[in-house]
């Protein structure tokens, strides 16, 4: 069976043996409240994202991926705009507009996947996963919007979830929409235009 699966998918046979030995913990999952797909399908998408980590862990034997590069000195009492500014400074982005959130997240060690969710109402979601004591965030993009602007916003929204998780701020007390806006276009830049 392994051989047939390996040949059909074009994966090395070692992957199937190696993937079974990976002990992964899903620390948290964030699905946007506006997501309208049924809960049972949301569970399936979470599992697909878990499989993405298994594939990544296998590929790390051949490819060096960027390490997680997220600020660790968040203060949960800072306002949302200050938290967004802190991430921008940490990543040395200045105050300009961010054109490509996908590349920005990936070079900072956040894995972004397009799970090919061809369902209306499917939105991006995130997971924090740990394998062998190493944590990594994964973002899965919803596939019902093809606009680069919307995709950038969705990724900034998921970054807000990551920041809230790292700062240990409850979701109810943290506006991910406000963070996404402040991160993508800081107030200083907006008022200059």
Q: Whereabouts are the PLM-identified features?
A:
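Short juxta-domain linker segments that transition from a proline/glycine-rich
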Residues: 1-193
């Amino acid at each position: 069976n392994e051989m047939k699966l390996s040949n059909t998918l074009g994966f090395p046979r070692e992957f199937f043996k190696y993937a079974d030995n990976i002990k992964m913990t899903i620390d948290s999952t964030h699905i946007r409240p506006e997501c309208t797909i049924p809960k049972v399908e949301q569970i399936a998408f979470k599992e697909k994202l878990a499989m993405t980590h298994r594939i990544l862990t296998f590929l790390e034997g051949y490819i060096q991926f960027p390490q997680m590069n997220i600020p660790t000195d968040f203060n949960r009492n800072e306002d949302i705009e200050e938290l967004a500014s802190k991430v921008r400074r940490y990543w040395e982005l200045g105050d300009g507009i961010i054109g490509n959130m996908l590349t920005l997240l990936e070079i900072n060690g956040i894995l972004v996947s397009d799970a090919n969710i061809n369902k209306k109402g499917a939105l991006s979601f995130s997971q924090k996963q740990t394998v062998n004591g190493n944590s990594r965030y994964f973002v899965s993009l919803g596939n019902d919007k093809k606009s680069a602007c919307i995709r950038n916003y969705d990724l900034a929204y998921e970054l807000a979830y990551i920041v809230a998780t790292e700062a240990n701020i409850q979701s109810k007390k943290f506006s991910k929409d406000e963070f996404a806006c402040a991160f993508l276009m800081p107030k200083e830049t907006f008022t200059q235009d």
